[in-house]
């Protein structure tokens, strides 16, 4: 839950690192205590021990920082947050290898060869013309030391990250889904208890702070189905921040994904 790791408008790296260390240990435990319907699945999991830790609440984190999804700042934050997650996930898996042993097929793997996910960019670049591979390769953490540690101590898990849609669990936690922009600021949700209206709490808070939350605004939001783009009273800054999925230029979503995938 990325938004829980934003403090004072910035990413709390120390808290995020602590969360990741706990999460990776938990996921590794699941491999051993899980129920497997077929022996092939059990054998594969115990042999390679892959886990997939992802994120949710990315859009909420941007709301907390006052950043529009369609901006360079959002792309940079996507890069920074995923680097921190990747770094400490790999580090924790390597620590677990010391404690519990490396996964059985570690020898000869890319990890064993000192090839981390960030290093795979170089392999791709060699196979493509330079003009077709323009990817930001900025690094903020000490990857050389981590690379050496992985080669020396091994890895407990063959894979450590996977970004899931989190469609259900994000609703349970009350945050935005996965790494996606908000689908709508206002919508009707249905379950066995009936139908109820859900409105973006960050939008309500921002409007209240500016003295814009009143009956007229409520009716305007209903009329435009949660979109703020055609409501004249709302400042352009808020229109950018609270743009919904189909109002954000696709290139920003692709740029953010491009930055994340290198980790």
Map each language-model feature to its residues.
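Glycine-rich, acidic/polar active-site loops that bind/position phosphate-bearing ligands
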Residues: 2-22
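Short beta-alpha connecting loops at secondary-structure transitions
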Residues: 7-13, 40-44, 72-82, 184-194
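Catalytic alpha/beta core of large soluble enzyme barrels
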Residues: 24-34, 136-140, 149-263
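Flexible loop/turn segments at secondary-structure boundaries
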Residues: 4-7, 37, 60, 71, ...
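Internal maturation/activation junctions in enzymes
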Residues: 19-42, 46, 50, 68-166, ...
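Contiguous, well-ordered alpha-helical segments that form the cores/surfaces of helical PPI scaffolds
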Residues: 28, 49-64, 168-171
